Protein backbone atom coordinates (compact mmCIF):
# COMPACT_ATOMS: atom_id res chain seq x y z
CA UNK A 1 0.00 0.00 0.00
CA UNK A 2 1.60 3.28 -1.06
CA UNK A 3 0.44 6.77 -0.15
CA UNK A 4 1.18 9.55 -2.59
CA UNK A 5 2.19 12.03 0.10
CA UNK A 6 4.68 12.27 2.94
CA UNK A 7 3.24 12.20 6.45
CA UNK A 8 4.57 14.61 9.09
CA UNK A 9 5.39 11.70 11.35
CA UNK A 10 5.20 7.92 11.17
CA UNK A 11 5.05 5.16 13.74
CA UNK A 12 7.63 2.58 12.61
CA UNK A 13 6.00 -0.33 14.45
CA UNK A 14 2.51 0.29 13.15
CA UNK A 15 3.76 1.11 9.67
CA UNK A 16 5.79 -2.11 9.60
CA UNK A 17 2.71 -4.12 10.61
CA UNK A 18 0.79 -2.62 7.72
CA UNK A 19 3.72 -2.61 5.28
CA UNK A 20 3.16 1.07 4.58
CA UNK A 21 4.97 2.94 1.84
CA UNK A 22 5.08 6.66 1.19
CA UNK A 23 6.29 8.83 -1.66
CA UNK A 24 6.09 12.56 -2.12
CA UNK A 25 7.76 15.95 -1.98
CA UNK A 26 9.04 17.78 1.06
CA UNK A 27 9.39 21.57 1.31
CA UNK A 28 13.03 22.33 2.25
CA UNK A 29 12.26 25.87 3.52
CA UNK A 30 11.71 24.91 7.19
CA UNK A 31 14.82 22.69 7.30
CA UNK A 32 17.15 25.12 9.07
CA UNK A 33 20.13 22.80 9.63
CA UNK A 34 20.26 21.82 5.96
CA UNK A 35 19.60 25.43 4.89
CA UNK A 36 22.69 26.62 6.77
CA UNK A 37 24.86 24.35 4.64
CA UNK A 38 23.45 25.55 1.31
CA UNK A 39 24.38 28.58 -0.76
CA UNK A 40 20.74 29.29 -1.70
CA UNK A 41 17.27 27.89 -1.21
CA UNK A 42 16.95 24.26 -2.31
CA UNK A 43 14.23 23.03 -4.63
CA UNK A 44 11.69 20.47 -3.42
CA UNK A 45 13.02 17.26 -1.95
CA UNK A 46 11.47 14.11 -3.31
CA UNK A 47 11.47 11.11 -1.08
CA UNK A 48 10.05 7.64 -0.79
CA UNK A 49 10.24 5.17 2.05
CA UNK A 50 8.60 2.02 3.27
CA UNK A 51 8.39 -0.15 6.35
CA UNK A 52 8.51 -3.89 6.83
CA UNK A 53 9.73 -6.45 9.34
CA UNK A 54 13.04 -8.29 9.26
CA UNK A 55 13.43 -12.07 9.86
CA UNK A 56 13.48 -11.42 13.58
CA UNK A 57 10.41 -9.27 13.60
CA UNK A 58 12.06 -5.86 13.97
CA UNK A 59 10.62 -2.89 12.14
CA UNK A 60 12.86 -1.80 9.26
CA UNK A 61 12.61 1.42 7.28
CA UNK A 62 14.11 1.63 3.80
CA UNK A 63 14.08 4.99 2.08
CA UNK A 64 15.67 7.43 -0.28
CA UNK A 65 15.57 11.16 -0.93
CA UNK A 66 16.71 13.29 -3.85
CA UNK A 67 17.16 17.02 -4.21
CA UNK A 68 19.09 19.60 -6.22
CA UNK A 69 21.07 21.44 -3.57
CA UNK A 70 22.85 24.74 -4.35
CA UNK A 71 26.46 24.57 -3.13
CA UNK A 72 29.58 26.65 -3.71
CA UNK A 73 32.18 24.87 -5.83
CA UNK A 74 35.49 24.83 -4.01
CA UNK A 75 37.47 24.89 -7.25
CA UNK A 76 35.91 27.83 -9.10
CA UNK A 77 33.87 29.38 -6.22
CA UNK A 78 30.72 29.46 -8.40
CA UNK A 79 27.38 28.22 -7.29
CA UNK A 80 26.25 24.89 -8.71
CA UNK A 81 23.43 22.43 -8.13
CA UNK A 82 24.56 19.27 -6.44
CA UNK A 83 22.26 16.36 -7.27
CA UNK A 84 22.05 14.86 -3.80
CA UNK A 85 20.81 11.36 -3.27
CA UNK A 86 20.48 9.75 0.13
CA UNK A 87 19.62 6.10 0.70
CA UNK A 88 19.04 4.68 4.11
CA UNK A 89 18.00 1.55 5.92
CA UNK A 90 17.16 1.89 9.58
CA UNK A 91 16.44 -0.96 11.92
CA UNK A 92 14.29 -0.34 14.98
CA UNK A 93 15.71 -2.34 17.86
CA UNK A 94 13.43 -3.98 20.40
CA UNK A 95 15.63 -3.32 23.42
CA UNK A 96 18.82 -1.56 24.39
CA UNK A 97 20.74 -4.85 24.22
CA UNK A 98 19.32 -5.50 20.78
CA UNK A 99 20.33 -1.98 19.76
CA UNK A 100 23.93 -2.52 20.93
CA UNK A 101 24.23 -5.82 19.10
CA UNK A 102 22.91 -4.36 15.86
CA UNK A 103 25.11 -1.27 16.13
CA UNK A 104 28.16 -3.52 16.59
CA UNK A 105 27.27 -5.14 13.26
CA UNK A 106 27.47 -1.68 11.71
CA UNK A 107 23.73 -1.27 11.17
CA UNK A 108 21.94 2.05 11.33
CA UNK A 109 19.80 1.31 14.34
CA UNK A 110 17.45 3.24 16.61
CA UNK A 111 15.79 2.25 19.83
CA UNK A 112 12.96 4.60 20.62
CA UNK A 113 9.32 3.93 20.69
CA UNK A 114 6.92 6.41 19.23
CA UNK A 115 6.64 8.33 16.02
CA UNK A 116 9.45 9.49 13.76
CA UNK A 117 9.62 13.08 12.52
CA UNK A 118 9.76 12.59 8.77
CA UNK A 119 11.20 16.01 7.81
CA UNK A 120 13.91 15.73 10.47
CA UNK A 121 14.90 12.26 9.27
CA UNK A 122 15.10 13.28 5.60
CA UNK A 123 17.07 16.41 6.54
CA UNK A 124 19.56 14.33 8.52
CA UNK A 125 20.04 11.89 5.65
CA UNK A 126 20.55 14.65 3.08
CA UNK A 127 23.14 16.36 5.31
CA UNK A 128 25.03 13.06 5.43
CA UNK A 129 24.89 12.91 1.63
CA UNK A 130 26.55 16.33 1.17
CA UNK A 131 30.12 16.20 -0.20
CA UNK A 132 32.99 17.29 2.09
CA UNK A 133 34.51 19.36 -0.72
CA UNK A 134 31.77 20.33 -3.22
CA UNK A 135 32.96 20.62 -6.83
CA UNK A 136 31.29 20.85 -10.25
CA UNK A 137 30.93 17.20 -11.29
CA UNK A 138 31.62 18.13 -14.95
CA UNK A 139 34.88 19.88 -14.10
CA UNK A 140 35.60 23.61 -14.14
CA UNK A 141 38.40 26.15 -14.21
CA UNK A 142 40.08 26.87 -10.89
CA UNK A 143 39.83 30.46 -9.68
CA UNK A 144 42.36 32.54 -11.64
CA UNK A 145 45.20 33.97 -9.56
CA UNK A 146 45.86 37.68 -10.09
CA UNK A 147 48.20 37.84 -13.09
CA UNK A 148 51.21 40.16 -12.92
CA UNK A 149 50.11 41.47 -9.55
CA UNK A 150 52.04 41.32 -6.35
CA UNK A 151 52.74 37.76 -5.26
CA UNK A 152 50.70 37.15 -2.12
CA UNK A 153 53.79 35.93 -0.27
CA UNK A 154 56.14 38.65 -1.53
CA UNK A 155 55.85 40.53 1.72
CA UNK A 156 56.53 37.40 3.70
CA UNK A 157 59.66 36.61 1.65
CA UNK A 158 60.97 40.13 2.32
CA UNK A 159 60.30 39.72 6.01
CA UNK A 160 62.13 36.39 6.13
CA UNK A 161 65.11 37.83 4.25
CA UNK A 162 65.32 40.70 6.71
CA UNK A 163 65.14 38.37 9.70
CA UNK A 164 67.94 36.17 8.34
CA UNK A 165 70.05 39.24 7.82
CA UNK A 166 69.39 40.55 11.32
CA UNK A 167 70.36 37.28 12.98
ZN1 LIG B 1 33.46 24.75 -10.22
Segment roles from a protein language model:
Residues 1-70:
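A positional/architectural concept
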Residues 76:
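Conformational-control "hinges and anchors"
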Residues 73:
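Short cysteine-rich clusters marking metal-coordination/redox-active sites
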Residues 1-19, 43-44, 81-167:
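Charge-rich, low-complexity linker and terminal segments
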